[in-house]
Amino acid sequence: MLMRQKGIIIKAVDYGESDKIITILNEHGAKVPLMARRAKKVKTGLQAQTQLFVYGLFIYNQWRGMGTLNSVDVISQHYKLQMDLYVSSYAALAAETIERSMDEGDIAPYNYQLLQFVLEKIESGTSAQLMSVVVMLKCMKRFGFTASFNRCAVSGNDTQADLIGYSFKFDGAISRQEASKDVHAVILSNKTLYLLDVLQKLPIDKMNSLNIHQEIIDEMSDIILMLYREYAGMFFKSQKLINQLKRLEQ
């Protein structure tokens, strides 16, 4: 059966010498794996059209199991995401988070909206690292956990100025008054905890101007990755490349 669906490529894996397996997130919020024959060959014209983040109309044959890609009518290549290794790596982290949050057969229209929002924000100049944090905050529940950043997990104190870190012992933010009860709590700036709470709760259509200091973004990114490792056992391939890039700069 010949299918036509708009979507965004969220995963691309080389298969053999000349083929690729791509996964698109279609406009209905479903993952669609497709075999792209000879996509690594320049002459087929599919090499550029099967890159990560390509948004287009995908035409493919679908019977049982994996479909076979025929062609792509590209709407946007998202070129700006490919121009900088850090930008493309954090965008890939966002895409990987969404892809891994979904099981086969899941339908999640919000994930499609989230991905489109994030890619557009990155292209318009918003920090790709910050956008990866937004995605990971929004996807937490799909990985089976949540995190509270606006009150002390020990005392219930919700005075934001008193919160100084995150406690894995008590599974939540911790205040300076209770800090002695967990000497291994991850110390965070008060602003980091405040912004994590805001971004976690704020609908994406209300996120207009997102100008946050890089040190705060780094803190948010680090604690979010720790939460995913601790609570969901998740290690992201995209993050490995980011770590390698950071080591090269040292």
Curated annotation (Swiss-Prot):
Question: Which keywords fit this entry according to its UniProt record?
Answer: DNA damage, DNA recombination, DNA repair
Species assigned in the record: Staphylococcus aureus (strain Newman)
Question: Taxonomic lineage per UniProt?
Answer: Bacteria, Bacillati, Bacillota, Bacilli, Bacillales
The source's domain of life comes to Bacteria
Function, in words: Involved in DNA repair and RecF pathway recombination.
Q: Which gene encodes it?
A: recO
InterPro entries, per this entry?
A: ARFGAP/RecO, DNA_rep/recomb_RecO_N, NA-bd_OB-fold, RecO, RecO_C
The name this protein carries in UniProt is DNA repair protein RecO
Cellular component, GO annotation: bacterial nucleoid
On whether Oxidoreductase is a keyword of this UniProt record, the answer is: no
Q: Name one GO biological process term.
A: DNA recombination
Family designation: Belongs to the RecO family.
